[in-house]
Amino acid sequence: MAAITASAVNEFRQATGCGLMDCKKALVENEGDFEKAVVYLREKGLASQAKKATRVAAEGMAYAAVIDGVGVIVEVNCESDFVAGGPLFNEFVSGVAKVIAKEAPADVDALMACPWYTGKGTVDDAKNELFLSVRENMKVRRFERIEGKCVPYVHMKGKVAVLVELETEASAEAVTELGRDVAMQICALNPQYLDESNVPAADVEKEKEIRIATAKQDPKNAKKPDAIIEKIVVGGLGKWFKEICLLQMPFVKDDKVSVEQHVAAVAKELGTPVTVKGYVRFEKGEGIEKRQDDLAAEVAKMVKG
């Protein structure tokens, strides 16, 4: 039997839309015959997956957890909230997180080729097996893995997930409440940056120019010199930083202090420094353009078969 080349497997994968390992196995079992391999996949119930691969998967869930001391956040998409709320999909997402924590894959492609956490097959195999049950297009969209002291937060069954990384000598248990409070702040207000020092200088300059132009159009500033207007605007940038930077934001549970001040107060109580080192926020379906179906047309299509 001729060897099955990587290019042949890739070509077959592009033609069918099925998983890499499934395509390779189908070709091996059928001695490289594409037509027989397609029949093989159809018999396994996998070929229909290719037809659904182009359908928009904008539902699903964002998930965050700490697994064996490793922080993981991942977004997995499917087509309907019905499937997203089911136990099989939730188990798959949880399993994906376990694999990410253990295997530390470089990207999604590498993740899909990793061994499944049960020891049976790969992540791609597990996804294909789930497809046979739910019959929906699914995709592991993105993930982050952090080896540090992390606190996870999942909002509304996976609509938003947040992973906060803290730097401290305090125990994970001691900073759990703080981390959760900060994560809830991130979830609700979606800050663009951790701290004002992280805001690119070009963005600050652009905001400054916009505010100066706006101020000059205000009749109250008609007689003020440009230098005075600029000074007023620069002084007002602090308010802008409070809107876009996590640590400068008013703390949601006590808006008399900033998040940074609240963290400092907790650190003082614990008797050891605590720093918010970073965070990741995933919102389910963020940036995915959902298909807008015409219900009447869809029903008519179903009736016609």
Listing of model-derived features with the role each one plays in the protein:
Residues 2-305:
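N-terminal assembly/interaction segments in proteins that build large macromolecular machines
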